[in-house]
A protein has these predicted regions:
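Acetyl-CoA-dependent GNAT
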Residues: 3-15, 19-83, 92-94, 98, ...
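Short glycine-rich hinge loops at helix-strand junctions in the catalytic core
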Residues: 86, 103, 126
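Residues forming the Rossmann-fold NAD(P)(H) cofactor-binding site
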Residues: 89
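Hydrophobic, well-ordered secondary-structure scaffolds
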Residues: 96, 131-135
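Conserved GNAT acetyl-CoA-binding A-motif
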Residues: 99-112
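Conserved beta-strand-loop-alpha-helix junction that forms the acyl-donor binding cleft
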Residues: 109-119, 135-138
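Conserved acetyl-CoA-binding loop of GNAT-fold acetyltransferases
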Residues: 122-132
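Terminal substrate-recognition subdomain of acyl/acetyltransferases
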Residues: 134-148
Length: 148
């Protein structure tokens, strides 16, 4: 998963997108963070038939960026392999199915407030903006999708 983050940061540099690549994302969320989330059973991945990871994220049942106690799964560190097509949408669909299986009503995430293409992507997948959040230099928009 960490390798995908590094690959995506390089892609952002190439595309002139200023997000993870200029915020020290790989230092805020180093390899040890992902190893810990894996050991806690909180890291999830979508793989191809050969076992290569196409998309991955950390799924949490609590998130300090949200102040309510609605039954939700919170998607963090979502990353897809560059060129993996609709892997992100497929991952989020499956994350929603998982959330329903464990009796959650919402799938929630946040994204950078200055990334309009990503905002449109999430809105097209049914995630509506419901507020903002701040984490150090990061300023984000909280989004949720009602599942039931």
């Amino acid at each position: 998963m960490f390798d995908l983050v590094l690959e995506r940061m390089k892609w952002m540099d190439e595309k002139g997108i200023e997000q993870w690549n200029v915020m020290g994302y790989d230092e805020v969320y180093p390899l040890s963070y992902y190893e810990q989330k894996c050991s806690e059973g909180r890291a999830f991945a979508l793989e191809n038939k050969d076992g290569a990871i196409l998309c991955a994220a950390v799924l949490l049942e609590n998130d300090s960026r949200w102040s309510d106690d609605a039954p939700a799964i919170y998607v963090h560190n979502l990353v897809s392999k560059v060129g993996a097509g609709d892997a992100g949408a497929n991952f989020l669909r499956r994350a929603g199915e998982y959330a329903l299986r464990i009796n959650k009503a919402y799938l929630r995430l946040d994204s950078s407030e200055n990334n309009e293409p990503l905002a449109k992507y999430y809105e097209n997948l049914g995630f509506i903006p419901v507020g903002t959040c701040t984490d150090g230099p990061y300023k984000g928009v909280r989004r949720e999708k009602k599942l039931k």
